[in-house]
Regions:
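Structural beta-alpha unit
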Residues: 1-2, 79-112, 157
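Small/aliphatic-rich secondary-structure junction motif
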Residues: 2-54, 136-139
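Short, well-ordered secondary-structure micro-motifs
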Residues: 23, 50-53, 100-101, 124-125, ...
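Short, solvent-exposed amphipathic alpha-helices that sit
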Residues: 26, 62-74, 98
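General small-molecule cofactor/ligand-binding pocket signal
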Residues: 39-41, 87-91, 142-144
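Acidic, proline/glycine-rich short linear motifs
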Residues: 42-69, 151-157
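Short, hinge-like loop/turn segments at secondary-structure boundaries
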Residues: 55-59, 104-107, 130
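Glycine-rich, Arg-bearing micro-motifs that act as flexible, cationic patches
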Residues: 111-136, 148-154
């Protein structure tokens, strides 16, 4: 930013779940209202590719193409919603580990935004990062409830 301060980025982990959309909207609205940015992280699970080398490479490329497509679709939605153009980050590995590695490697990421499921469990990523890491997280974590309406998300941002 021009005044010498770092831009705060909101990190969102992208997947195919409905709660991901709530987290995306929250991050985009907060970025819009604070002059920040959004980083969308898509993590491809490596255990999906435990096949013969040629087949594994083809599957890896297909997974990467699907990740790029998903991120592209969401980027269009975010830009239309609030004028935010997010950064993309596609990684392969354990989701929780990749989230932590990205946070450590990008000092501008200031908040991790996660979407919680509507059931009794908030979901595996929320459980893993918040319940197990808790006070050891290097940045604040915002958990957006799965049952929260889009209107309510907009109102609190």
């Amino acid at each position: 930013m021009e005044d010498g301060t770092e831009m705060r980025k909101f990190l969102v982990v992208v997947d195919e779940t409905p709660e991901c959309m709530n987290a995306m909207r929250f991050a985009a609205r907060r970025a819009q209202n604070t002059g920040g940015g959004v980083v969308m992280l898509y993590v491809i699970a490596p255990d999906d590719f435990q096949h013969w080398v040629g087949v594994a490479e083809l599957m890896r490329q297909e997974a990467r193409d699907a990740a790029e497509s998903r991120l592209g679709e969401l980027a269009v939605e975010l830009n239309a919603l609030c004028g935010v153009t997010p950064e993309f980050n596609i990684r392969e590995g354990n989701r929780a580990e990749q989230v932590l590695e990205l946070i450590e490697s990008d000092s501008e990421i200031g908040v991790l935004v996660l979407g919680a499921g509507e059931g009794e469990s908030p979901g595996p990523l929320v459980s893993q990062l918040v319940a197990k890491m808790g006070g050891r997280m290097p940045i604040p974590v915002t958990v957006v409830p799965g049952a929260m309406s889009l209107e309510r998300i907009d109102a609190v941002c």
